[in-house]
Amino acid sequence: MRYSHTLQQFSILSFFVTIWTVQSVPPQPPIRCDQTGCTVSNAYGTWPDRKTCHAANVTYPTTEEDLRKAVAYAAEHNLKVKTVTKFSHTIPKLACPSGSDALLISTSKYNSVIEIEPELLTVTADSGVSLRELIEKVEGAGFSIGTSPYWEGVSIGGLISTGSHGSSWSGRGGSVHDHVVGISLVVPANQSEGFAKVVRLEEGRDDTLLNAVKVSLGVLGVISKVKLSIEKAFKRSVTYNFTSDVALEDIFMEHGKKYEFGDITWYPSRKTAVYRYDIRAPVNVSGNGVNDFLGFQSNPILISKGVRALEKGFESSKNENGKCTTADTTLAYKKLIGNGLKNSGLIFTGYPVIGRQGKIQTSGSCLYSSSIRIDVACAWDPRYNGLFFYETTAIFPVSRFRDFLLDVKKLRDMKPERLCGIDIYNGIFIRFIKGSKAYLGQTEDSVVIDFNYYRADDELTPRLNQDVMEEMEQMAFVKHGAKPHWGKNRKVGFFGVKQKIGPNFDKFLEVKNKLDPKKMFSSEWSDEILLGTEASKYDGCALEGNCVCSEERHCNPSKGYFCKEGLVYTQARVCRFSPAQVIVM
């Protein structure tokens, strides 16, 4: 009960602070340089391998010609190049170049041009334009962008490069790259062309190249401009239904078909499903609602530190009940405040919440700076030792998803407490995306899941019930054939991805060899992810998802974690706590 009382205090304090505070300390820039060179990190401060990424220099172009000159310089001098966005929210090491003499091209200052063509229903933006800037410009002109990721701390060039998405099986679907109708790309060229050139691609004219560039992982060149389809402005009406997860496996498909922007959040340990009833509404319907998703709101830094300390305490004492109490408190709080929906832009007063598409489709209020509040920030900001977690994101063919849900229910029913760790975060988040023409996209209508879970401060520290998370991971990617989201996941999620993509993988490589024959934009890390190859195994490699264990040493025998078969999916190999077998090293 002590943990429950403490967490309630944290929740109540956080509630009243976030009511009045919508601004916070902005995230730190991903690139930092000194006289010895530069380093680049992601927004979480730590790459999957926990190793620092180095480069010799960085350039900040502000125009397309600046961008072309930067690529030309690198091509002329045989330098490796990686593009880095202002936000750098990709979890895999895609932004890290090979070799310490490489050049980073930041698009953080390449963000001045947004051009709307009303008669064509398109908008073209510099690749460094932030999602929020783009939405505000489009909405201000009386239009809406049909979809977006739920997190707005991304640039337009960065978000399409990794396949970012919202949730929809309607129209062009929930993936932003499927709303792309044109891209300008800067690629290396021969000396007679000035060592670099701009390639302009249009839907219907250059589909072979465009289908590769839509989701490119940054290995084809530097995206200069993105042209998206837009539509007449509209509103959305949103209601959350917190209810039982009974028959979830039979309901999910109809839910995805019925609600244009619907999603489901499943808290398996709590046997609760939250169905989002999210439909389109006419622009003249009354309502100025805002989606200020709880997880993306500013958090008092002391609270973020406190929550992390509590979770570390539960881990070190193997306190499942503490995690379950936290999950109960978190879920109750989300229900109380509508998970961040606000009817008037200030507080939640009841359903439905109706607001403009641009105010409902994405959120991220913790991004924005304030001159008077320096005690609040995004909960995962690495400067403040707050939340630190893994994120597994799997994309299932619709036909395979029901069996996955049933497998997770079997795993849950053996001992629900084992899954409280993911329910502290956001449970298993379920969204819907359409089949795509992008070569690295999904080939058929699909269901996407996300789940977050605790990551230890030290790479060799095992985690409470980590075997259950690993079994779910292997259920998804191995047993049920899910593909990984390119911008998320631990390394094991990418194993065998080449085979899952099928013939489109060779089409992508053909374009890659044409646009960047010298592999200027590739690195060992992007190759590792794109090819899905398994690296050599080492002591403790399974603890952080860098391998699937096959020997005890791949876990941590000295702390009682051994390589075992899965509880439901017995072909899985996971690191499980077995205290009777502890080996003293």
Swiss-Prot record:
tRNA processing as a keyword of this entry, yes or no, is no
The keyword Flavoprotein belongs to this UniProt entry's keyword annotation: yes
User: The organism sits in which domain of life?
Assistant: Eukaryota
Chief localisation class: other
- Kindly state one GO CC term assigned in the UniProt record: membrane
Q: Where is the FAD-binding PCMH-type domain?
A: 51-233
Q: Which SUPFAM superfamilies match?
A: FAD-binding/transporter-associated domain-like
Q: Which InterPro entries match?
A: ALO_C, FAD-bd_PCMH, FAD-bd_PCMH-like_sf, FAD-bd_PCMH_sub1, FAD-bd_PCMH_sub2, FAD-linked_Oxidoreductases_BP, GULLO2-like_C, GULO_Plant
**GO MF, one example:** L-gulonolactone oxidase activity
EC number(s) per UniProt? 1.1.3.8
Enumerate the cofactors the protein uses. FAD
Q: Which reaction does it catalyse?
A: L-gulono-1,4-lactone + O2 = L-ascorbate + H2O2 + H(+)
What broad class of enzyme is this?
A: oxidoreductase
**Which first-to-last residue range defines the signal peptide?**
1-24
Compartments it resides in: Vacuole
Provide one Gene Ontology biological process annotation. L-ascorbic acid biosynthetic process
- Give the keywords, sorted: Ascorbate biosynthesis, FAD, Flavoprotein, Oxidoreductase, Signal, Vacuole
PROSITE patterns (UniProt xref): FAD_PCMH (PS51387)
Tell me the pathway. Answer: Cofactor biosynthesis; L-ascorbate biosynthesis
Q: Give the similarity note.
A: Belongs to the oxygen-dependent FAD-linked oxidoreductase family.
The protein's job, in short, is: Catalyzes the oxidation of L-gulono-1,4-lactone to ascorbic acid. L-gulono-1,4-lactone is oxidized to hydrogen peroxide and L-xylo-hexulonolactone which spontaneously isomerizes to L-ascorbate.
What protein name is recorded for this chain? Answer: L-gulonolactone oxidase 3
Provide the taxonomic classification.
Eukaryota, Viridiplantae, Streptophyta, Embryophyta, Tracheophyta
